[in-house]
Each structure stands twice: as structure tokens, then as C-alpha cells.
Amino acid sequence: MLRPWLKPVQVGKYAGKRAAVDAYSWLHKGAYSCALELGTNNRWWIRQRRDAPYVRYCIHRAQMLRHYGITPVIVFDGDRLPAKGGEEKDRRERRAECLRKGHERLAARDRDGATFMFAQGVDITPAMAHELIAALKREGFEFIVAPYEADAQIAALAQLGAKGDPGGVDIVFTEDSDLVAYGCPLVLFKLDKFGEAQELLLEDVMAGPPAEAAAGVNGANGAGVDGDELDDDEDGIAVVGGARGKKKGGAGAARSKPGAKGPLNFVGWKHEQFLELCVLSGCDFLPNIRGIGIKKAHALVAKHRSVAAVLAVLHGDKKIHVPPGYDDDFRHAFWTFRHARVYDPLQRRLRPLNPMPVELEDEATDTAFLGASVAADVAVEVAEGRMDPITRKPFVVPPSPQKQKGWTPRGRSQGGGGGCIKNGGGGFIKNGAGTGPAKPPPKPIAFANLFAGKKAKTVGRGLNFDAG
């Protein structure tokens, strides 16, 4: 769906900017390199007092961004949301099945097959995340642990950046298109080891299809960011959650749609309508109605302009089965995106991503679907990486690993100039001329500590998608 708006970019373009990074997207990629060891519980790096391969992968990526003049802020997932209970259960079952098949293939001496299945069943735990946090502290990188969804926390940092508040971010690195639904204005996907990525500007999406895409030259099938293509019907990747619709007949042409096979058109849409489309087509918080995929959802929202009208139409269609309680579940999913609980590094407490609507401010309203609101002191301990966000118990600090090799830019050895050069003390320095004394590693600091003692500000609504 988003492919027509993706543009290749070299991250050096954003030198001097601050970037939020979805930590778990990096951890998952890094874990693939040691999937066999994780699947068989052979964690040799602990015995050798070395960083785990998934930690080294993340640190190298962070060092690369630092080399290009970008300040990364690594954002971790926190506790599980009740709204994702069903999705989490399905994922656990899929992982367990993959692990079972991995052990079967290993017993059959199929090492490659076992590695593949173990990679599909990798589960990133809070303990693994804490290993990365320890390494980030050691290398002086900023980080923050979200109370719940990292995506919502990243969106909150993007709000701060848009307002010019300290600690905000200008860009986002992720592999999850949920960040577009959350309203992040600038998202980069597919970051590789050479600093090349795919850039997506939300304002471009809302301004309509690019000229070449509208003409059918690029992205005529509206492929998603993960490369999965939409077919002529509804079996396509939605904006959020990867939910798939079944192949069904069309629901009629949308007024804002350039053609049956062309990219979707959001000209004249408000961000609220865009988010309604994302939820309606299926997301982590709510599966799609059978027969309602991304294209049909777009057609319905474009025609009726509000989800209330869309739901009324669906309830009146005898060919569509709307599950019992779907209307309430839809509102909860929409509110979970819009009003997620996030950590405010300025006020050092939790707040909603956007101010609560009147119906959620009523004390009689059950807001358990947003996750429990925790005390400020607990929120700080979680955000600064000292407390497990799920068990709410202090982490055990892992032993410090031995010195390890760092990232170097393409085509350069660690002895050359212009890169990140490892010094005798284990830190990394910018060395444009290849000479000069090595600087000590930066002082470890948690992102959430940056604003301690500063006057708290009230964070407003942040980004305004309704203008124009």
C-alpha cells in the first residue's frame, strides 16, 4: 500500500537530526544470526562474557547512525496491552510450533531447516532487551522503555520533535508501518548496513499518489512496505498489523480512488479518517471483518466519510457478517492508537498520547484496554531500564563483556580516517584525519534522565493533521 510513496535515501541526509529507533525491530533482525543457538539454548556468549550477537547487531547500527551525524534514541516495548491479548496468543502458538518443527529438523540432521524454523520462532524477551540496554549505557546511547507499545512512545517523541521541545525526534526508523497510523510525519524503513533506507513522508501520502504511480508506472498494485503486493481484489497487506482481507467482490468505487489497480488516494482526508481505515482493514488490536480488506475499507471510508456511517452500512449488508461487539471493539482499537499511554520525559510520568475524549475521562468508563496507569516512580524505573516492564521487578545487571569490534563505514578499515574508530579504552570517536588523541567514551545516560530537574511542560495535542 505504501510503496508508491517510498523513496530511497542515504541517512547522511539527516545529519544533525535526532531519530527514534524501534529497538525490537533491530533485535529481531540481530537474533536471526544466532537463531540456532537461541532455539537450543546454547548461549555461548554468556560463557565467553561477550555481547550477544543480537546486541552487537543493534550497537553496530546505532554506531552507524552516530557516524552519519544522527543521534539515535532507542525505544523499547514495555508491558503487553490487553487489546493485543488475542494477537499475542496467536504469536505464542506460532512460535511454539516453529520451535517444535525446528527441534524435529535438528533431530533429522537438517541443520539449515532447523535454523530457519528457529528463526521464525524467535521471541525477544525483556531480559534480551535489557542486555541491549546495558550495552547502550556502556556506549553512551540514549534509550527509553515505553510503558506499553514502543510505537506509541515513538509517536510521542515525534510530537515533541514537531513542537521543538527538548528530547523530541525528527525521524523514525522502523520496519512496522504502524508508525504511519500513529501519525509520525517522517518514517524510514529498510535501513541497511550501508546507511541506505526507504523514506516515507506522511504529508506526501495525504497529498495523493505520486504522478508516476497514478499513471501506473510505479506501485500500480499498491504494494506494502514489506514487498507483499495487493492483488486485484482484497487480499492485500493493510497499513497496520499485516491483517489480510479475503478475496471478495468490490464494494464500489471510491470517489478519491484513481483506478481499480492504482494506488489509494487520500486527498482531502483527515488523519482521523486515515486511522479509521487502518483499524477497519485490520490491525494488532482488532482483526478485520471477513471480506473487508484494505481496498474495500478505503472505498467505504472515502464514500461515507465517517466510521459510524461505514458501520451502519456493514450492519445493513446481509452478505457481511459483523462479529458481535465489533462496534465497541472498533472504538477501543481506535482509542488505543489515538490515546495510548506513553511516558513523558519532561514531566516524568505517564500521559495519553493525545488528550482523552470526554467519554474516556468519565471515571465510570472502563479504560483497561489502554493498560493500567502506573505510579510515577514505577514509570520512571521502567523508562530508565532498571525495572522489568512486565513483572515490575528490578533487573539483574549483567556482567560487563570484553572489548569488541565496532562498526566501520563501507570500504574503510578501522585504521583509516573518517569512520568510527575504536580507541584503547573501548570507546568510539569521529576521526576525520585518522590522527589525534582518542576521546573517552561518552557518559552513559538514559534518555529519560535527560530532563531531570527541568521545569515540566504540558504537552499539547502535538501534530495537527486536520489543517487544510
Regions found by a protein language model. Give the residues of each.
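Eukaryotic beta-rich interaction modules
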Residues: 1-5, 56
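Non-catalytic nucleic-acid-binding/docking modules located in mid-to-C-terminal regions
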Residues: 6-15, 209-219, 224-468
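Noncatalytic, basic helical substrate-engagement surface that gates or grips nucleic-acid strands
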Residues: 13-149, 153-164, 218-221, 230-233, ...
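Intrinsically disordered, low-complexity regions enriched in proline, serine, glycine
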Residues: 30, 84-85, 145, 182-183, ...
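Amphipathic alpha-helical interface elements that mediate macromolecular binding in regulatory proteins
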Residues: 53-63, 130, 134, 152, ...
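Acidic, metal-binding active-site segment of PIN/NYN-like and related structure-specific nucleases
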Residues: 154, 162-191, 223, 243, ...
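Acidic, PIN/NYN-like endoribonuclease modules and their adjacent C-terminal/linker elements
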Residues: 184-216, 228, 259-261
